[in-house]
Amino acid sequence: MSRARNSYRNVTGSPGGVSIRRSHHIGCLQAYLRPVTDAGLLILLTCSDPACRTVAPHGGTAPRFSPNPIAAGIPTDGDPILIDISTSSTSNGLCSRLATTGQRLPGSWLIDRDGKPTDDPRVLASEQGGAILPLGGMDLGYKGFGLALFVEALTNALGGHGRADEEPRWGASVFLQIVDPERFGGKTSFLRETSFFAQFCRETPVPPGKPPVRLPGQAALQCRKEQLANGVALYPTIMPALVPWATTLGVPLPITSSAR
């Protein structure tokens, strides 16, 4: 990311784009956005996994895609707008965690092998033959399906390696594009516009007793500030999973809040 950002500063002409194939686990896409927006640049970041099939196309009953997230960072005069959404109704990670703990999803975001909606994450097990619905669910899933195809084109197709290769190992295909507003209408007018519509959205009337409109990334930025000051809150199953690795590698575990 740093290499792409720094190289872009030295290139004139069209916006810069980078394609990566067989990447390691990329993690949360939003984590990569802030350094770019802090430099006053616009960023688009997407990824797919050619070896992963957990999401069904709209109208189908068998998985064909990975969740195919799309992330974008938009600079403003204040905090940036940080967008990070899957083109599926939910993520593999959430389904895995809930299946492990025997919990259900908040909604019927999956389908079983017969195409019936369900909130049971266990249908994603290979022998069950279920799938995650695309963003929009049973009724409007054509929207998520279309976005998933767009991500497939940006990542696997542009990278020259994808599902047609029947990759047996997991590995992300990544597409990154960075745009300098100065090369278009100018940075000043860009920030004027992005800052205006950010504030315009915050000032939108809401029903009585409801919180104000929250921009994408706003809650995450606030959580980051709090956890930098008070410590990082981990999902309950993470620390137990780290214990055997820490023991094997001789690495001391961090002190948890309950042990302080």
Language-model features: locations:
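A glycine-rich, acidic short-motif signal
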Residues: 1-81, 87
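Short glycine-rich or small-residue beta-strand-to-loop segments that form or flank ligand, phosphate
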Residues: 16-21, 134-136, 176-182
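Conserved active-site and cofactor/substrate-binding residues in soluble primary-metabolism enzymes
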Residues: 27, 31, 67, 130, ...
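Glycine-rich phosphate/pyrophosphate-binding loops
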Residues: 42-54, 153-170
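Phosphate/diphosphate-binding glycine-rich loops and adjacent basic-rich segments that engage nucleotide
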Residues: 54-126
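Secondary-shell segments that build the walls of catalytic and ion/ligand-binding clefts
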Residues: 103-163
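Catalytic-core signal marking the mid-to-C-terminal active-site face
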Residues: 153, 164-260
